[in-house]
Amino acid sequence: MALLKNSGETAVEWVEINTPNELNSQLAQTIIDGYTKYLTIKDPMLAMGAFNEFKILCALKIGPYGANSVNHQAEQILQRKNLIGDNPAGGHSWYRGRPVMITRNDYSLGLYNGDIGITLPDPDAADNKLHVYFQDASGDVRRFLPHRLPEHETVYAMTVHKSQGSEFDRVVLILPDKDYPLMTRELIYTGLTRARQKVSVWGTEPVLTTAISRKIERSSGLREALWE
């Protein structure tokens, strides 16, 4: 905790967040600062690179501090700033800049659980038809019409669990306002080490200190539902 609170110019920052309202207030400028850059880029490869510079990671998937809620908040914030189009379906309609993560493998398309794509107009077409662009392991960019994608979700924020194996320049790690069995030192470590340059941890001191003192426990169905 001393490192987080007194990090100065180091790569770790602590932000005390005690209520959902405080979280939403803190998110407002963070979302604008983190995602404006990629939303102004037309080239798919450059947009994907800019998008991956910043990520919001949540310990939970559900609840006011979870990835689902933060994704909804992010869309509302970006809409109010006219950075994305109107999306009344809350993540289930398509607009320029929508980031999506595949949640079910489709071997015929070569798209797999955890793959992230960006929705953009075809830069070489006059009709501005939207495609979702993915970068594969070789660095090549592939595109798909939105209706062809397997199961997916909007991904301005993602769970720590889903972020494993990924790295970003800057990370915000959001902890819940109360303790859960899945809050372990391994989860905190995973969240912190997703950042190449800077990580900002948002939460309460009791939740963080309890998590750091707990080693990973055996999984359960409820744990997986909250975690993923």
Predicted regions and their residues:
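Conserved helicase motor core of P-loop NTPases
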Residues: 1-100, 106-109, 120
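N-terminal start-of-chain detector that recognizes signal peptides
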Residues: 27-30, 71-72, 89-92, 103, ...
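Short hydrophobic-aromatic micro-motifs
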Residues: 56, 101-102, 173, 201
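Structural motif
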Residues: 59-61, 104-105, 176-178, 204
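C-terminal accessory regions
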Residues: 115-228
